[in-house]
């Protein structure tokens, strides 16, 4: 999965997919009542990027729905996965459940079109704080209450705080999550980070009793760091330059082992090295 980083304006969906992304990451900020409000990152952000592009969250979902609904004039067949980077740092811990509830209602209405031919992309809810695991509970219980539990088949999870892998496993246990787990590791492109924790995550994925289904690394903009991540066995790379990742993947050393995921590839299924 080539994951376009910080896609927060509708116009950027086309831009990143046209550069080779089959997945995008979108920032979601919340108001003080835990409503998802804007797709917005803010300053500071990755080096070389404009930090302030934004839409209202529900407006963005409308654009995303069009981009992922077959038959729509804006449809991109290859856009198959969306990571919502949930900026829950602005919330109190006791608001996490509410945030999950409100997020589910927004997606149900504006993305899934109440279950009637809505957008088809798989969704990863990426949460920066292990203490906010109840966001997952709120999300799940709301879709059940709204009589669309089947949409949970399209939803996966990520804790993005670079926490100890054992601690992440405990948070999933509390949230009752037993699958659909993506594990991120990374740092802003302005700084360097080694691959030690990525290798631990890959080892967990490849073990017989691990909780991780997929591992992705962020934010990778250079050919050398792309090769290093691929050599470590990741499933996804988040980038500001999808064309760079696509180019490295086309090298003969990688074409034998990697290909770009399509809609038929289940993102919750573990593919071991």
Curated annotation (Swiss-Prot):
Chief location bin: secreted
Alphabetized InterPro entries for the sequence: PLC-like_Pdiesterase_TIM-brl (IPR017946)
Keyword Disulfide bond: yes
Residues that hold Mg(2+) according to the record: 25, 27, 85
GO process annotations (BP): killing of cells of another organism; lipid catabolic process
Role according to the record: Dermonecrotic toxins cleave the phosphodiester linkage between the phosphate and headgroup of certain phospholipids (sphingolipid and lysolipid substrates), forming an alcohol (often choline) and a cyclic phosphate. This toxin acts on sphingomyelin (SM). It may also act on ceramide phosphoethanolamine (CPE), lysophosphatidylcholine (LPC) and lysophosphatidylethanolamine (LPE), but not on lysophosphatidylserine (LPS), and lysophosphatidylglycerol (LPG). It acts by transphosphatidylation, releasing exclusively cyclic phosphate products as second products.
Residue numbers annotated as active site: 5, 41 (nucleophile)
GO CC terms, sorted: extracellular region
Keyword annotations of the record: Cytolysis, Dermonecrotic toxin, Disulfide bond, Hemolysis, Lipid degradation, Lipid metabolism, Lyase, Magnesium, Metal-binding, Secreted, Toxin
Tissue: Expressed by the venom gland.
Gene3D superfamilies, sorted: Phosphatidylinositol (PI) phosphodiesterase (3.20.20.190)
Signal peptide: none
Organism: Loxosceles sabina (Tucson recluse spider)
Source organism, top-level taxon: Eukaryota
EC number per UniProt: 4.6.1.-
Family affiliation: Belongs to the arthropod phospholipase D family. Class II subfamily.
Compartmental location: Secreted
Needed cofactors: Mg(2+)
Pfam family, one: GDPD_2
Record protein name field: Dermonecrotic toxin LsaSicTox-alphaIB1aii
